[in-house]
């Protein structure tokens, strides 16, 4: 009871800075650790050559689709589970947790099987050139099969977090990431296994994270049993899971689509461009995931304050989140822009074209990254306030609604520069849209506040 009261105090009455740090930082650290997987592979594989670096860049969006499946069931179930546990309905919560986990594994296995059968065609569609294809196949055959562990881990991460076991999720993520950092150079260079070694290192790291979650469950530390007997999907249960899970999956698919479109456009200019853009994607993802993680802590505060009609608290949460996230984005963006040459040089053996391409794109992405915090605060805010359609649209702008037309059209008129600057241009358009939607939202909030005040005076 005390723990539940403490959580309610954080959401409803604790100072905003304290509440944001308590709720946002653990998730932010978890997201940052997750991003390390992608960056570490790229860093060590880069020493093998541009085609090898291009190979893991091409395979990357395929892995993101699988992660999306885990997020769909895990994130979708987590919200429902928290509500069920809150009202003491442990039996239904058990069934939901088991159904979400086994559904994600089942559908994940089907996607993995399909991907394995049609792997070469999928990689070609994702932008693999003739010189990249052999390395992409070698890496993907192992990586795709190991994604069954990734689906399990992502789903469990969200489900276990819903019962408040943040230390377990942190341990699973951290152990896997640290192991991957150690195993990559061992398999890639010492055992001379190249990209195959990178895939094996990632697979082993994911398996170890899976073992952490299995140990947690088998020692009966979880409030959920995860028994196969509890697997009982009903229409109402799946509707509750998927109404949150499907938008999450769509956002993840848009990320995969944007990377795939960049790879396909880059393939017209050679392996160096694919490798350079792949490095930029992984570098910028370190920053974006930190902001996403922090704002996961902002959302429940905003939603609670809005539901409780505490408009002053809501405005303070919005203002503080914008200041903090923009300050972070300003520092990270300037580092990416000012040191773009030095940063991108760490991901190649000295390929001058890759350095030139990566430096230009990273510089531009660094400048527009300064705007990312403002954009993400409002895309998160709309969802937190229950304005699903607006939140979904705004969330889809940066890598979907705005990005897809830009990456399809701009290279036709601007050549390779159209690829390098597609994401920064989409970012600027997305922020302009955000400004108009934010102004409209604040007018709505002011009207709602006046209505509450007039009702209280009657």
Task: For the regions a language model picked out, list residue spans one by one.
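Short runs within selected transmembrane alpha-helices of multi-pass transporters and secretion channels
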Residues: 74, 143-161, 169-177, 198-211, ...
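Hydrophobic residues within alpha-helical transmembrane segments
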Residues: 25, 29, 59-62, 102, ...
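Short alpha-helical transmembrane segments in multi-pass integral membrane proteins
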Residues: 1-24, 81-148, 190-246, 302-368, ...
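Hydrophobic transmembrane alpha-helices of multi-pass small-molecule transporters
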Residues: 65-68, 180-185, 210-214, 286-289, ...
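Helix-terminus/linker motif at the lipid-water interface of multi-pass membrane proteins
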Residues: 32, 36-54, 123-130, 186-193, ...
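Small-residue-rich hydrophobic transmembrane alpha-helices
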Residues: 53-113, 150-169, 276-340, 372-394
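Transmembrane helical elements of multi-pass membrane transporters/channels
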Residues: 22-41, 142, 153, 176, ...
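N-terminal transmembrane alpha-helices
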Residues: 11-43, 47-48, 64-76, 80, ...
